[in-house]
UniProtKB/Swiss-Prot annotation:
Residues 513-520, 556-564 are annotated as: PI(4,5)P2-binding region. Residues 44-71, 747-820 are annotated as: Disordered. This is Sodium/hydrogen exchanger 1. It comes from Rattus norvegicus. The gene is Slc9a1. It catalyses: Na(+)(in) + H(+)(out) = Na(+)(out) + H(+)(in); Li(+)(out) + H(+)(in) = Li(+)(in) + H(+)(out); Li(+)(in) + Na(+)(out) = Li(+)(out) + Na(+)(in). Belongs to the monovalent cation:proton antiporter 1 (CPA1) transporter (TC 2.A.36) family.
């Protein structure tokens, strides 16, 4: 029985075989590359193989020894002479030689990065698997397989060193999150995020540590020697939500912005609590006695670590913004300042045991608005894509090395301790979210629903930060560190695999609001700022100094002092609202070009253009034209609809995105109708035709004039115009002949008027030609002209040589030549 490839998990051979071949080749090369290298020279191979060199470990790779060890019998190999009989014979020049130790470190790092990139490509090529299993789970599985293969061939798998993780892999992820942080959402929910990050993490650490200490007392001889400080330290490590795991899972399920910023903001800001508790309990473990003063100093260190990290980040962010002011002549190095200053902020914070994550976030948030105002658009694109690429590769390497380190590490298993840790983590998370949400909802305008609380509790994932902190434990002070590391890996695997794989179907089952992918329009931005100013004025009138008041004060200070120092040129003086009007006019111009109406742009003053207001001109010249009542009513409708949308966004805390525009289809249809009307008007203007019907318009035949050479005898019913040849341009020289006769003849010949046109002549000599359209099926859905803007009613100034439409000569009645 033959099976079709398309029926086996949706796999397709051309898609999966190249990825599998490359992966198998890389995995097969790794054990070989981790050896001491291949030598084509047998003498050198014997000498180097007799005594293996000592190796120095840097992170997850092993570097070559600084000084090669030579065999004692190695005498003057540089002369390349070998004794052969009685004559000294010079050795042949080596055509090919391999020195793997020279390129070992960068080559292995490149192989791991290449493996990570190929894994990401392979997962997205197979959409069936990636839609069910999160990418982080698949990467951990790949790490387990690679580690098992390396260990199976007798080699030692590389281990994820804590220094490599904290100094090289973690900063790109945090910088990407901090630089592109949605600042408005973050500040509007800052109180809720801080409560979850600080109070929630403290609750989880002490609740978990206390219960685990009680379990250790009754758990058996293997865990009886674990003290209270040990369990509290372990609780502080395992209680923090990991930002890498949260980003990896929440970006795939596209959860709404409120829940995403709450969970992700908690994972970012709980770093200060984790660092303080970790160093506090680590120091207390070496003390013989812990006093009240030590506890007070530990409490004080929390503010020093958190606020100190923020201060370091702000300083480096301001320096980066000020430096970017002078890079207008050297655009190439602009992105480099963003990366270097941010990384130096992280390293400076780690130098003083401050929160490096807080420093990175603060530096990214502070420098972004000023740097983007100074740098070019190409530099901005470079920064964006480089940060995304760097963070994506780092995240992939972290999850792969989690799997490899699980195979390489030494483990100690205890069912009681591991299962208790897993259960207490879940219980502490659920209780903490429920209690804190009950307290938070008393002060929030937009309450957190039970569905939101469930997603927040279920999204508390653990990751590589807990693993790296557990690996840093000293075995001298913590003899049970192997048991702690095993329990940490178990919790990480449970949260990433079980919770990460089931959160997507649970979100769909509970019908939790998803993220809106549409971008915010200029109209949305303008009215959002209008509401901010309105709420600021209301707070001033009421005497209540809320966050709108302080935000307005900060914006005024920023505009008056900071922008002048950090932003170069005139860009710091341009009002933001005028910039939005400029964007709106540009958008309207693009729409006109796309609709084909660029040649018909009116020359009147735009009602939305702020460029028409000249500050130095007279007051009478700055008055905008008066609007009609229809225009005012249309503006009221637009404002009313947008204010209603903004109020709905405030209820859902989703103000930075737009729902699907219900008027978009009507707007497109209106553009299509305008385009058809312009095309019809252009035909009328170019060809002097007045259509009675859009499908069959009668043409207009030109009347003959007296100065025309008469090759044929004209018909009697045609009017003759006599023009004085002395002054043919003067209107007095034009004599309209047989005008009344033409009307009578036309009336007698044609009978009642059947042409769907009606002529009316006013006092100025302007003919009003109104076309009557007969009802025909299928014409209503094409275009229905109105009484004012339709080309059916045209005011055409009568030409002196054109008496108007008249019947064409009938077929078969040619002109007779004169004199015949």
């Amino acid at each position: 029985m033959m099976l079709r490839w398309s029926g086996i998990w949706g796999l397709y051979p051309p898609r999966i075989f190249p990825s599998l071949l490359v992966v198998v080749a890389l995995v097969g090369l790794l054990p070989v590359l981790r050896s001491h290298g291949l030598q084509l020279n047998p003498t050198a191979s014997t000498i180097r193989g007799s005594e293996p060199p000592r190796e120095r470990s840097i992170g997850d790779v092993t570097t070559a020894p600084s000084e090669p060890l030579h065999h004692p019998d190695d005498r003057n190999l540089t002369n390349l002479y070998i004794e052969h009989g009685a004559k000294p014979v010079r050795k042949a020049f080596p055509v090919l030689d391999i020195d793997y130790l020279h390129v070992r470190t960068p080559f292995e790092i490149s192989l791991w990065i290449l493996l990570a990139c190929l894994m990401k490509i392979g997962f997205h090529v197979i959409p069936t698997i990636s839609s069910i299993v999160p990418e982080s789970c698949l990467l951990i599985v790949v790490g387990l397989l690679v580690g098992g293969l390396i260990k199976g061939v007798g080699e030692t798998p590389p281990f994820l060193q804590s220094d490599v993780f904290f100094l090289f892999l973690l900063p790109p992820i945090i910088l990407d999150a901090g630089y592109f942080l949605p600042l408005r959402q973050f500040t509007e929910n800052l109180g809720t995020i801080l409560i979850f990050a600080v109070v929630g993490t403290l609750w989880n650490a002490f609740f978990l540590g206390g219960l685990l200490y009680a379990v250790c007392l009754v758990g058996g001889e293997q865990i009886n020697n674990i003290g209270l400080l040990d369990t509290l330290l372990f609780g502080s490590i395992i209680s923090a939500v990991d930002p890498v795991a949260v980003l990896a899972v929440f970006e795939e399920i596209h959860i709404n912005e409120l829940l995403h910023i709450l969970v992700f903001g908690e994972s970012l800001l709980n770093d200060a609590v984790t660092v303080v508790l970790y160093h506090l309990f680590e120091e207390f473990a070496s003390y013989e006695y812990v006093g009240i003063s030590d506890i007070f100093l530990g409490f004080l260190s929390f503010f020093v670590v958190s606020l100190g990290g923020v201060f370091v980040g702000v300083v480096y962010g301001v320096i980066a913004a000020f430096t970017s002011r002078f890079t207008s002549h050297i655009r190439v190095i602009e992105p480099l300042f963003v990366f270097l200053y941010s990384y130096m902020a992280y390293l400076s914070a780690e130098l003083f045991h401050l929160s490096g994550i807080m420093a990175l976030i603060a530096s990214g948030v502070v420098m972004r608005p000023y740097v983007e105002a100074n740098i070019s658009h190409k530099s901005h694109t470079t920064i964006k894509y480089f940060l995304k690429m760097w963070s994506s590769v780092s995240e992939t390497l972290i999850f792969i090395f989690l799997g490899v380190s699980t195979v390489a590490g030494s483990h100690q298993w205890n069912w009681t301790f591991v299962i208790s840790t897993l259960l207490f983590c879940l219980i502490a998370r659920v209780l903490g979210v429920l209690v804190l949400t009950w307290f938070i909802n008393k002060f929030r305008i937009v309450k957190l629903t039970p569905k939101d609380q469930f997603i927040i509790a279920y999204g508390g994932l653990r990751g590589a930060i807990a693993f790296s902190l557990g690996y840093l434990l000293d075995k001298k002070h913590f003899p049970m560190c192997d048991l702690f590391l095993t329990a940490i890996i178990t919790v990480i695997f449970f949260t990433v695999f079980v919770q990460g794989m089931t959160i997507r179907p649970l979100v769909d089952l509970l019908a939790v609001k998803k993220k809106q992918e549409t971008k915010r329009s200029i109209n949305e931005e303008i009215h959002t700022q209008f509401l901010d100013h309105l709420l600021t004025g209301i707070e001033d009138i009421c005497g209540h100094y809320g966050h709108h008041h302080w935000k307005d004060k900060l914006n005024r200070f920023n505009k008056k002092y900071v922008k002048k120092c950090l932003i170069a040129g005139e860009r710091s003086k341009e009002p933001q609202l005028i910039a939005f009007y400029h964007k709106m006019e540009m958008k309207q111009a693009i729409e006109l070009v796309e609709s084909g109406g660029m040649g018909k742009i009116p020359s009147a003053v735009s009602t939305v253009s702020m460029q028409n207001i000249h500050p130095k001109s007279a007051a009478s010249e700055r008055i905008l034209p008066a609007l009609s009542k229809d225009k005012e009513e249309e503006i009221r409708k637009i404002l009313r609809s947008n204010l209603q949308k903004t109020r709905q966004r405030l209820r859902s805390y989703n103000r930075h995105t737009l729902v699907a525009d219900p008027y978009e289809e009507a707007w497109n249809q209106m553009l299509l109708r305008r385009q058809k009307a312009r095309q019809l008007e252009q035909k009328i203007t170019n060809y002097l035709t007045v259509p009675a019907h859009k499908l069959d318009s009668p043409t207009m035949s030109r009347a003959r004039i007296g100065s025309d050479p008469l090759a044929y005898e004209p018909k009697a019913d045609l009017p003759v115009i006599t023009i004085d040849p002395a002054s043919p341009q003067s209107p007095e020289s034009v004599d309209l002949v047989n005008e009344e006769l033409k009307g009578k003849v036309l009336g007698l010949k044609r009978g009642p008027r059947t042409t769907p046109e009606e002529e009316e002549e006013d006092e100025d000599g302007v003919i009003m030609i109104r076309s009557k359209e007969p009802s025909s099926p299928g014409t209503d859905d094409v275009f229905t002209p109105g009484p004012s803007d339709s080309p059916g009613s045209q005011r055409i100034q009568r030409c002196l040589s054109d008496p108007g439409p008249h019947p064409e000569p009938g077929e078969g009645e040619p002109f007779i030549p004169k004199g015949q």
